[in-house]
Amino acid sequence: MAKIKARDLRGKKKEELLKQLDDLKVELSQLRVAKVTGGAASKLSKIRVVRKSIARVLTVINQTQKENLRKFYKGKKYKPLDLRPKKTRAMRRRLTKHEEKLKTKKQQRKERLYPLRKYAVKA
């Protein structure tokens, strides 16, 4: 099999990708048998290409799966941990913008009764 390009894989359905993955794995096992039995050098160099192709197919499968999960959980209140933004621990525990703006009744009353004084400077 020739080297597979990831952009060609992205248009395919999951069933097609899984079938291609199985084909590549079978081919890899055949190449490994050829290696043990003393096969041609061309077959030995092909092992690397097939391994990388398997990795490409798996990468595309995983990326599309994660993309679909992101679409599913978009707008929902709770998301799985691996779909949440990766921040530092401190940033995750920080108050939200809304929580920071909240004021107690006492604080609201004080601000209403004693507004900030504005002074005019005589020039």
Swiss-Prot record:
- In this UniProt entry, the residues modified to N6-acetyllysine are 19, 43
- Coiled-coil boundaries: none
Family, according to the entry, reads as follows: Belongs to the universal ribosomal protein uL29 family.
Q: Where in the cell is it found?
A: Cytoplasm
Q: How does it assemble?
A: Component of the large ribosomal subunit.
For this entry, list what GO says about its biological process.
cellular response to UV-B; maturation of LSU-rRNA from tricistronic rRNA transcript (SSU-rRNA, 5.8S rRNA, LSU-rRNA); translation
List, alphabetically, the GO terms of the cellular component aspect. cytoplasm; cytoplasmic side of rough endoplasmic reticulum membrane; cytosolic large ribosomal subunit; cytosolic ribosome; large ribosomal subunit; synapse
Lineage, top-rank taxon, reads Eukaryota
Looking up InterPro entries in the UniProt record yields: Ribosomal_uL29, Ribosomal_uL29_CS, Ribosomal_uL29_euk, Ribosomal_uL29_sf
Q: What is this protein called?
A: Large ribosomal subunit protein uL29
